Structure formats: structure tokens, C-alpha cells
């Protein structure tokens, strides 16, 4: 009977420690948040906070890549293709409670710093909310 008690307590502990912090999930994951975030993401949908208009994003090569160690690559086809830039590089970091991610990148001498609230962080899907409340959904690239 004692042998059954310890695995149950361990599973309960895991469930409490890994409870979902993000509104759209996951509720539980054994993978650390950084591991789930550190991959290449393709934007698939944009939701405007002020109008609630949902815009599907075409597969045009745009991506956001969070690299292990805190580096970042960002490419927005609509903004960067006409100036011939392959990608913007920068850095990223979690907030202390890992509910937000701050990205910093430079493009043609101009720097940009944005903080996004993580709404969803699954192994194959991500949703970020910007400072204006606009939400962008991403899928694993």
C-alpha cells in the first residue's frame, strides 16, 4: 500500500508544479516552457483586439525563431522582402514568472523592443498578445 502512495504523491506534485499558466494551454506539460518556445514559428492568424477581425496569414516565409541561449531571428515577408533583408537578429528572454517574453532586435540600424504576453505555448502551437492586445497565432515551422 505504501508503494502506491508515493507515485500518487509524485504525480500530484507534478500536476501542481506544471499547472497551465497560459489561457489557451496547455494545462499540463512535462516539457519545460523554454524547450517548447525554442523553435521556429510560422505566423498563421492575426486577431485585431480593437475590431476582433481575424486575418489568416499566408505561408509567405515569415517566421519567428527563438534559439536556445536567448538569441532570436525574425523575418516578416511584407516588411522585409522589398528591402532585401534576410532576417533581423536579436535576443529574447522570459519574464520572471514566464508568462511574458520580451524580444529585442535590430533592423537596418533601428532597434525594437517588444513584450508579448504568452497566451498559448504548446509544442506545436503558440499565441502571443502584443502591448495593444492584438493576438498572433503561430505554428511549428
Describe the role of every protein-language-model region.
Residues 1-7:
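Bacterial N-terminal signal peptides that target proteins for export
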Residues 20-141:
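Lipid interaction determinants
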Residues 15-18:
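C-terminal motif of bacterial Sec signal peptides marking the signal peptidase cleavage site
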Amino acid at each position: 500500500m505504501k508503494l502506491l502512495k508515493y507515485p500518487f504523491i509524485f504525480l500530484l506534485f507534478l500536476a501542481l508544479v506544471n499547472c497551465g499558466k497560459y489561457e489557451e494551454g496547455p494545462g499540463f506539460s512535462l516539457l519545460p516552457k523554454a524547450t517548447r518556445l525554442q523553435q521556429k514559428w510560422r505566423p498563421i492568424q492575426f486577431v485585431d483586439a480593437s475590431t476582433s477581425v481575424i486575418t489568416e496569414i499566408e505561408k509567405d516565409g515569415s517566421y519567428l525563431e527563438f534559439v536556445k541561449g536567448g538569441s532570436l531571428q525574425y523575418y516578416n515577408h511584407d516588411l522585409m522582402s522589398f528591402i532585401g533583408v534576410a532576417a533581423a537578429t536579436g535576443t529574447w528572454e522570459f519574464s520572471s514568472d514566464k508568462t511574458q517574453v520580451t524580444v529585442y532586435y535590430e533592423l537596418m540600424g533601428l532597434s525594437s523592443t517588444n513584450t508579448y504576453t504568452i497566451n498559448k505555448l504548446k509544442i506545436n502551437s503558440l499565441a502571443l498578445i502584443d502591448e495593444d492586445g492584438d493576438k498572433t497565432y503561430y505554428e511549428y515551422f
